Regions:
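Anionic-ligand anchoring segments at beta-strand to alpha-helix junctions in alpha/beta enzyme folds, i.e.
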Residues: 1-7
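Amphipathic alpha-helical segments within well-ordered protein domains
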Residues: 161-168
Length: 284
């Protein structure tokens, strides 16, 4: 658990590692970084130990924006701010350990002291976020939840699986279907997008690939945009938040999640991927 990980990382109990109640009482900038469901559960304890002038710091706007579902409503005599790194917690940590940062958005929800913005930006620098862009709690959570459900995760898995299944149904081997769907994307094409943009990736592919991609991209946009709009509306209405809270608050949540992830792991597409990853030059 997180307590054991903290001990392994060198934190010392009763010196700089405390239970939530004690940490909230001692702190002046309280970084509230539990899971969304965990924040709901711990909020009465944290709220009771906030002091006038404290700063309540979030990395995600979920608890504040969907307060009708979370009951997280901070007192008026504290600053409420957000720094949302554009990556997973694991990425933030590994980049920090390597002396690198990760882009982040920041927002001030409540400025009791008159210094909330300065405190927010200073804390962002402290975690290694050198490039910041300002947003609001609402915009952060609405874009974040939409991105996770669509292009960043949900749509990505769905699109990968759809193409893989089409290729397999037309007689292509698992290896070929995986390579043409995922391996080439991750190893060759996506790094080019990251390096200099989509046009750079197009420019470094064959003319046949360029023509096909340019012709088909608008068709996918027109097909997918209504689905993404539907997702966005469900996010801003709070429907997706309610689903997440109800699911993640169940006593068997972890067991059910493990089952769902195991089902993904055992899909033929990803089984083929395990074999192919082992054949990458760096793994031989």
């Amino acid at each position: 658990n997180s307590w054991e990980k903290a001990l392994q990382d060198g934190w010392v109990e009763d010196e700089n590692l405390f239970e939530i109640e004690e940490a909230a009482h001692r702190g002046t900038i309280i970084q509230y970084l539990l899971s969304d469901a965990g924040q709901i559960q711990a909020w009465p304890t944290v709220e009771a130990n906030l002091s006038k002038g404290d700063a309540l710091y979030f990395s995600h706007g979920f608890g504040i924006v969907f307060h009708e579902h979370t009951s997280i409503v901070p007192p008026e005599n504290v600053d409420v701010m957000l720094v949302a790194p554009k990556g997973s917690g694991l990425t933030v940590r590994t980049h920090f350990q390597a002396g690198r940062g990760i882009n982040a958005s920041f927002a001030v929800h409540q400025n009791f002291t008159g210094q909330a913005r300065e405190r927010c930006i200073a804390t962002a620098f402290a975690i290694g976020s050198g490039h910041l862009f300002e947003t609001t709690f609402e915009k952060e959570v609405h874009s974040d939840l939409t991105g996770e459900r669509c292009v960043l995760m949900g749509l990505l898995q769905g699109a990968f699986l759809a193409q893989y299944e089409v290729l397999r149904e037309h007689g292509h081997s698992p290896s070929e279907a995986y390579n043409e769907t995922i391996e080439e994307a991750l190893q060759s094409l996506y790094p080019l997008i990251s390096e200099r943009g989509m046009d750079w990736m197009y420019a470094n592919c064959s003319t046949t690939a360029q023509r096909g991609a340019l012709d088909w991209a608008p068709k996918f946009r027109d097909t997918l945009k209504p689905v993404i709009e539907d997702c966005y509306q469900k996010v801003i209405s709070g429907e997706e938040a309610k689903i997440a809270i109800n699911s993640n608050s169940k006593s068997d949540y972890r067991q059910q999640l493990d089952k769902e992830l195991n089902d993904v792991n055992n899909q033929e597409m990803w089984v083929a991927g395990k074999v192919l990853r082992q054949l990458r030059p760096e793994n031989l």
